[in-house]
Amino acid sequence: MTESFIYPAATLIAGVDEVGRGPLVGAVVTAAVILDPARPVLGLADSKKLSEKRREALYEEITRYALAWSVGRAEASEIDSINIYQATLLAMQRAVAALAVVPDFVLVDGNRCPLLPMPSQAIVKGDSRVAEISAASIIAKVTRDREMAALHLQFPEYGFAQHKGYPTAFHLEKLALHGATVHHRRSFAPVRRVLELA
């Protein structure tokens, strides 16, 4: 962890993070993790700074040793209905609600917390400052990357396994060529433009 962080006075602290706000396709995926102080997971860091192999290894450790972990999501249709910002907060609420152990306090990556039934705090750059948030970022990233790999098998022409649905030049080219899948976010401008031209 980089900058030091002063933890709140609480016993069961959950970290929450999201992956997938920027892609043009698929769900926004969030995770909540309560780590076990008796069984620490070494090497936690912001998921974006880790190799895929390292993320996968840490995913296995986190899911094995954490006191509790869960995934929450908001689908493309929900993103289109309520916008990506609100959908992300909703997915975070779902992740916290799905925890098998109820946390005393929730630490959320970013600058805004969803409405939760327990105290919470937003931490800017929390995924590189707070172990619980780093763990959540890894769970969310691995989960979403696996979903994109599965989607790639259904629609290999779009290259989802490589770009994970982000608006790369390749993705935009294939979107223009093949049109949108049912999994694309219709409210996002590049997808909307393709649909308007269809």
From Swiss-Prot:
GO biological process: DNA replication, removal of RNA primer; mismatch repair
Cofactor(s) recorded in Swiss-Prot or TrEMBL: Mn(2+); Mg(2+)
Highest taxon listed in the record's lineage: Bacteria
Ranges of residues in domain RNase H type-2: 11-198
One Gene Ontology cellular component: cytoplasm
Principal location listed in the UniProt entry: cytoplasm
Entry's cofactor comment: Manganese or magnesium. Binds 1 divalent metal ion per monomer in the absence of substrate. May bind a second metal ion after substrate binding.
GO molecular function, a single term: RNA binding
Compartmental location: Cytoplasm
Residues where a divalent metal cation binds: D17, E18, D109
Enzyme Commission numbers on file: 3.1.26.4
Keywords, sorted A to Z: Cytoplasm, Endonuclease, Hydrolase, Manganese, Metal-binding, Nuclease
Gene3D superfamilies: Ribonuclease H-like superfamily/Ribonuclease H (3.30.420.10)
Catalytic activity: Endonucleolytic cleavage to 5'-phosphomonoester
Entry-linked Pfam families: RNase_HII
PROSITE patterns: RNASE_H_2
Similarity remark: Belongs to the RNase HII family.
UniProt-listed PANTHER family: RIBONUCLEASE H2 SUBUNIT A, RIBONUCLEASE HII
Function per UniProt: Endonuclease that specifically degrades the RNA of RNA-DNA hybrids.
Protein name per the record: Ribonuclease HII
